[in-house]
A protein has these predicted regions:
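Short, surface-exposed loop or secondary-structure junction motifs
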Residues: 32-35, 68-225
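Catalytic tyrosine of NAD(P)H-dependent dehydrogenase/reductases that use a Tyr as the general acid/base
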Residues: 46-49, 96
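A short, well-structured edge-of-sheet supersecondary motif
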Residues: 12-45, 59, 71, 75, ...
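Peripheral terminal and inter-domain segments
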Residues: 246-335
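Active/ligand-binding-proximal structured segments within catalytic/core domains
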Residues: 52-56
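Actinobacteria-biased recognition of intrinsically disordered, low-complexity terminal regions
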Residues: 1-9, 333-335
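Short, well-ordered beta-strand elements
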Residues: 37, 220-237
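Short amphipathic alpha-helical segments
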Residues: 7-15, 119, 268
Length: 335
């Protein structure tokens, strides 16, 4: 990646992406060549959803609580279901599978003081004054399919997996801290979806990133540590993933997407687990999942290309009869 990222065109790129995707509210901040540029509603806080996981992992590490068990929980290798601390089905045992429940268990190390620990260990030392768990008065509210405004409330016990509000400016500052420190959190623990997962971060060929999606919000924090580049993008729409994808592509910051060879006929079928479902047929994937906070069903369809592309498609088939769709290992159910 060259340093000639079109930083001066950031506002234009974001406006164009909003027009193409019909997303009403978005904010983007880009730090490159020692300078941060902003676009959109960058002074207002959005819910950052699962980007919170990096803050949780960072706090656990800084508190000296990072043992083997919590390392497994924070890397999604503990074998838990998406929202319950129960074992995955036998067909999926031993596979990497995304779990909010694992993050809640890891945060239990703070014995009920998780929110205070994140504030004292991470937010205050970094000067992140616009980041926190309580809904700010000037918060942007999320919108669900049908342009329904999402309820901003969020259960306290769910906070470790996705509860923070933040601005793109604060996220860039947080990202820059990770560009220069905490390398132990960036060491890959498991391989999945054409990339590697560390502790609260995806690792792909020199890039670190994490996406977020909950309650009508879509978000991304993307870093290139060796070049001290940080990009934060926040949106208030379920269509926000498309906007963020366009912005990343237009800035020339998209990590390479890895694919693996496969036989289409061998993976066609229906896969399900705990409300997550995927139908693989005719060279495409149709996935559906419940929003973990609102319960709203979300559906998307994309070409069958095992691996992942940032903010778009993500699927692989780690063993016969199992698909990892949308980051969750799902057993096949139509045999």
């Amino acid at each position: 990646m060259e340093s000639a990222v079109p930083q001066g065109r950031l506002a234009e790129i974001v406006r164009d992406a909003q027009t193409r995707t019909d997303v009403s509210r978005a904010a983007v901040a880009l730090h490159v060549d020692g300078r941060t540029t902003f676009a959109g509603e960058h002074r207002r806080p959005f819910r950052i959803a699962s980007i919170t996981k990096s803050f949780t992992a960072t706090a656990v590490s800084l508190a000296g609580l990072l043992d083997d068990r919590r390392r497994a929980l924070l890397s999604h290798t503990a074998g838990y279901r998406p929202e319950r601390p129960d074992p995955l089905p036998p067909e999926c045992a031993g596979l990497w599978s995304y779990s909010n429940a694992g993050y809640r268990e890891a945060a239990s190390a703070f014995e009920g003081e998780y929110s205070a620990a994140v504030r004292e260990l991470v937010l205050e030392p970094l000067g992140l004054r616009h980041t926190g768990f309580e809904t700010p008065d000037d918060a942007v509210l999320g919108t669900l399919p049908g342009d329904v405004v999402a309820d901003p409330s969020y259960a306290v016990e769910r906070r470790p997996g996705g509860g923070l509000w933040s601005t793109v400016g604060d996220l860039v500052e947080y990202g820059l801290a990770h560009c220069g420190d905490w390398a132990d959190l960036h060491e890959p623990v498991a391989s999945a979806l054409g990339a590697h997962y560390a502790l609260g971060w995806w690792v792909r060929d020199g890039f670190l990133d994490h996406e977020g999606s909950v309650g009508g919000f879509q978000s991304l924090l993307l870093l290139v540590p060796e070049r001290t580049v940080a990009l934060a993008a926040l949106t208030n729409s379920w269509r926000g993933s498309a906007l963020i994808h366009h912005v990343v592509e237009d800035l020339g910051l998209a990590p390479p997407s890895a694919q693996a060879p496969f036989e289409v006929e061998a993976v066609d079928g229906r896969y399900e687990l705990d409300g997550f479902a995927a139908v693989v047929a005719d060279g495409s994937v149709t996935e559906s999942e419940p929003d973990p906070v609102t319960g709203t069903g979300l559906e998307r369809r994309y070409p069958l290309r095992p691996g992942a592309t940032l903010m778009t498609w993500r699927s692989d088939f780690p063993r016969p009869g199992v698909a990892r769709i949308g980051w969750v290992a799902l057993p096949r159910v139509d045999r």
